[in-house]
């Protein structure tokens, strides 16, 4: 659940015994939890995350951002290919450069052609 105290401090609470319960080993490794954590992060920070690609729990995303651009690295740590990954950015961008992949930019959305098993892709989007 999400909670904001009288001082305006925000908390996101995941009620599970992660330390002592083997059933919680994959608690965060599923589609629904990924969407929930993404939404909680947006609420906690008061702004969108720089890049989000839900529906792929074994996809790791790293970002670097400044006032005019965002650089994104996607690493697929699973044995299955990710077909047509769709990455939602925190704002609209007008130009993009791809590294190790092909795709297209549509405002705040980047559509890649595919991401190979254990593969990576990267791009830099600019205002």
Please report, for each region that a protein language model flagged, where it lies by residue:
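Generic beta-strand structural signal
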Residues: 65, 104-106
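Carbohydrate-binding surface patches
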Residues: 1-15, 19-21, 54-91
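C-terminal beta-strand-rich structural cap/linker in extracellular carbohydrate-active enzymes
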Residues: 108-127
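Solvent-exposed beta-hairpin/edge-strand motifs
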Residues: 87-102
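Small side chains
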Residues: 85, 103, 121-125
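A short, polar/proline- and glycine-enriched secondary-structure boundary/capping micro-motif
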Residues: 23-26, 83-84, 107-109
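Hydrophobic, well-ordered secondary-structure elements that form the walls
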Residues: 72, 96, 118
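Glycan-recognition and catalytic regions of carbohydrate-active enzymes
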Residues: 28-71
């Amino acid at each position: 659940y999400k909670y904001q105290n009288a001082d305006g401090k925000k908390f996101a609470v995941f009620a599970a015994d992660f330390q002592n319960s083997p059933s919680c080993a994959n608690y965060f490794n599923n589609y629904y939890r990924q969407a929930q954590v993404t939404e909680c992060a947006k609420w906690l920070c008061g702004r969108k995350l720089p890049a989000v690609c839900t529906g792929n729990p074994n996809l790791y995303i790293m970002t670097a951002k400044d006032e005019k651009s965002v650089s994104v690295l996607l690493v697929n740590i699973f044995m299955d290919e990710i077909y047509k990954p769709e990455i939602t950015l925190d704002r609209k961008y007008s130009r993009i450069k791809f590294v190790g992949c092909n795709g297209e930019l549509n405002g705040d959305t980047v559509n890649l052609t595919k991401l190979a098993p254990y593969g990576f892709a990267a791009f830099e989007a600019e205002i």
